[in-house]
Curated annotation (Swiss-Prot):
Residues 1-52 form a transit peptide. Required for the control of apoptosis during postnatal growth. Essential for proteolytic processing of an antiapoptotic form of OPA1 which prevents the release of mitochondrial cytochrome c in response to intrinsic apoptotic signals. Required for the maturation of PINK1 into its 52kDa mature form after its cleavage by mitochondrial-processing peptidase (MPP). Promotes cleavage of serine/threonine-protein phosphatase PGAM5 in damaged mitochondria in response to loss of mitochondrial membrane potential. GO terms for biological process: protein processing; signal peptide processing. It comes from the Eukaryota. This is Presenilin-associated rhomboid-like protein, mitochondrial. Disulfide bonds: none annotated. Residues 120-165, 229-242, 288-293, 353-377 are mitochondrial intermembrane. The active site is at S275, H333. It is an enzyme of class 3 (hydrolase). It is found in: Mitochondrion inner membrane. The lineage of its organism: Eukaryota, Metazoa, Chordata, Craniata, Vertebrata.
Amino acid sequence: MAWRGWAQRGWGCGQAWTLPVCGGSYEELTAALAPSRLLRRRFNFFIQQKCGFRKAPRKVEPRRSDTSSEAYKRSALIPPVEETAFYPSPYPIRTLVKPLFFTVGFTGCAFGSAAIWQYESLKSKVQSYFDGIKADWLDSIRPQKEGDFRKEINKWWNNLSDGQRTVTGIIAANVFVFCLWRVPSLQRTMIRYFTSNPASKVLCSPMLLSTFSHFSLFHMAANMYVLWSFSSSIVNILGQEQFMAVYLSAGVISTFVSYVCKVATGRYGPSLGASGAIMTVLAAVCTKIPEGRLAIIFLPMFTFTAGNALKAIIAMDTAGMILGWKFFDHAAHLGGALFGIWYITYGHELIWKNREPLVKIWHEMRTNSPKKGGGSK
């Protein structure tokens, strides 16, 4: 009884050894406290603790992403696969420097490329007009093939509007990336480069690539349906070249707004989808045509004006960003909508109508470039 009390104290249970009230004699107590037996008990106790109860030290592993922590929040629309590793910077504001420069640089390059594209497109249209006259004459004397599959495809393509033909390439790119998500061996690469996260090691390229990335079929179908519905209106307002510059820039700008919100709130997590860029398209059309009538899919009997729809969407995304709703990236939606409103109101005058100096420089470069024969013009 006396030795059991000492062992309990040795185990660290906080129980001090006391003399037994009954059931023991002075000789038993003296024998229990003898040096040889006490040392043997200590030795045996040490061996038992080492071999029987002490756990081996765990190997230190690098910290992985924790989907249950408050610092890591994942939307329900992103893939449930583990990212390689998240290491949020101890200086989170510094992580926004590279994305900021990338956003400004990419936006400038997008609009510059669109201006040059429009210049080349106008030149090619003049040339194709004369080529078309020659082609029509050849088709008149060439026997026509009836029921040709290629002819049916060309007929379908020619019946599309300019806006629908423009967004067809965007939809095809989204479908291709969606298929890549189905390849198990590519999921780590897809998470790294096709989802945007300010806590990731790769910050800049996902700002653009995530705009074409969808993991959920419903997410992709809903976004592409909205884009297809507004394609004719937005291309009629901006033109094909300017629309592409606005769409790509909107994807990067909305992702940067998402980065800022995640860093400010500390709720890191990957995001993906074209919703930010599509919100720019929707906001631009609703701002330009506020009295247009819109309806919800599957509920065509309920209609409302485009201006009221835009106000409701902005209010919902603002509430979601403030209250921390996690199903959508409300900061990206809000950033895309505000960019669309700003561009239609001010950006078109400030950016697109001041593209002439760049076009003149490009024209001079094309005019002064060497001919194919090697001489200069």
